[in-house]
Amino acid sequence: MDVMTAVLTRRSEHTLRAPAPDDEEFAYLLRGASLAPDHGRLRPWRWILLRSGERAQLGLRIAEESGADAAATEALRDKYQRAPLSAALVFAPRGQRIPEWEQLAAASCVAHALMLLLHAREYGSIWRTGQLATSPGVGRFLGLRGSERLLGVLDIGTPEAGTAQRRRVPDDVSATITRFDDLARHRPDTAPQAEDG
């Protein structure tokens, strides 16, 4: 699959089943994804892979914090077992030389590149954030350290047959593009200066 096809056809897959990449295949795909833009080559991220019952613990931690009743606790436990692999992306800023916002952008680029690589190998994925990413209990369960924070969890598996979503038509983005010379004509501080003659 070429890159443009991967970008145009990737979708968030809500229904995922086995197989998912094993640890070796995940590491292989991550090696490719880690070539995403990363000023200073800091790799300000790490991934924690959760399989089997480990995934249910994410929902149980959220349920505990929110004081959920038994039915809600069960629903949250099930919610985080919808995929055979959950990969938690931990943002781990490194030093002050590269601004933290650039390091955060690098971690985000890695996640997107990984999703495209998974799609190219016929895996599905969906990016989950919300309460999961901000839960102190989930952070403790995952062993976050110091300034680390959870950006989200990527659920990974094989899409269910027959759940292919219709292809989206790319939006017209021309209104978001401005040529600088067009912009400069309307700004007095960039207008050409008359030469003395």
Residue ranges with predicted function:
Residues 11, 91-94:
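Short, histidine-centered active-site or binding-site loop motifs used for metal coordination
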Residues 85, 121, 149-152:
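Generic beta-strand structural signal
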Residues 5-12, 150-197:
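C-terminal helix-cap and adjacent tail motif
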Residues 1-82, 185-197:
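N-terminal amphipathic, basic helical "cap/leader" segment at the start of enzyme domains
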Residues 52-57, 64, 93-96, 136, ...:
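Short, charged/polar surface micro-motifs in flexible loops or helix N-caps
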Residues 86-90:
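Active-site-flanking beta-strand signature of metal-NTP-handling nucleotidyl enzymes
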Residues 138-151:
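Short, electropositive alpha-helical surface patch
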Residues 33, 95-141:
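Small-aliphatic-rich amphipathic alpha-helix that forms the alpha element of a beta-alpha
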